[in-house]
Amino acid sequence: MPFMPVPYVIEQTHRGERSYDIYSRLLKDRIVMLGTEIDDDVANVIVAQLLFLESEDPDKDINLYINSPGGSVTAGLAIYDTMQYVKCPVSTICVGQAASMGAVLLLAGAKGKRYALPSSRIMIHQPLGGVRGQATDIEIQAKEILRMKAKLNELIVKHTGQSIERVEKDTDRDYFMGASEAKAYGIIDEIQNPRKVVGLGKEEKK
């Protein structure tokens, strides 16, 4: 995969010019970007940003933008638990796609503050796992996969209001949704019209 340089933003201050990488600049406006597959390193950065923003202002919203194919369940749950732990409401916005653990994080946003852009794609499914080794090891890993499957299904039920029977059926295979379908399912609350966005962390005044 080709290296993508990180853009920098130049700002004028009373001390002169100051440069920020784009993610640090977004963080100033309480915007966190999850734009990759989820692994432990990515989760640690997201968790650190959430905790930092809570320490800065525990009453102000955090905006978590998600464009992710999913990834590690345990890493994703670290982000999920932190979202529930911090005092700040965490608004989630899907741009592009929120699949697998990405979808779980999308639906875990503060109630009434879960959004997707019109062309977003959302996908839920059961955890994936490949196991090799002795029969006993395979049995242990299989039980753990089933435990994680039940855990994720419980979270989907909790945040969407769907029945466990429907969630178990839908997650048995890859279940794709557009923004409208995700809203009907209870994964998001609103489809965000990009034209309403007028600035970083700001919404159009009415």
Swiss-Prot record:
Coiled coil: none annotated. Keywords: Cytoplasm, Hydrolase, Protease, Serine protease. GO terms for biological process: protein quality control for misfolded or incompletely synthesized proteins. Its main location: cytoplasm. It is an enzyme of class 3 (hydrolase). Pfam families: CLP_protease. Gene3D superfamilies: 2-enoyl-CoA Hydratase, Chain A, domain 1 (3.90.226.10). GO terms for cellular component: cytoplasm; endopeptidase Clp complex. The active site is at S100, H125. Signal peptide: none annotated. It is found in: Cytoplasm. It catalyses: Hydrolysis of proteins to small peptides in the presence of ATP and magnesium. alpha-casein is the usual test substrate. In the absence of ATP, only oligopeptides shorter than five residues are hydrolyzed (such as succinyl-Leu-Tyr-|-NHMec, and Leu-Tyr-Leu-|-Tyr-Trp, in which cleavage of the -Tyr-|-Leu- and -Tyr-|-Trp bonds also occurs). The keyword Protease applies. InterPro entries: ClpP, ClpP/crotonase-like_dom_sf, ClpP/TepA, ClpP_His_AS, ClpP_Ser_AS. The keyword Metal-binding does not apply. One of its GO terms (molecular function) is serine-type endopeptidase activity. Fourteen ClpP subunits assemble into 2 heptameric rings which stack back to back to give a disk-like structure with a central cavity, resembling the structure of eukaryotic proteasomes. Cleaves peptides in various proteins in a process that requires ATP hydrolysis. Has a chymotrypsin-like activity. Plays a major role in the degradation of misfolded proteins. Belongs to the peptidase S14 family. This is ATP-dependent Clp protease proteolytic subunit 1. It comes from Myxococcus xanthus (strain DK1622).
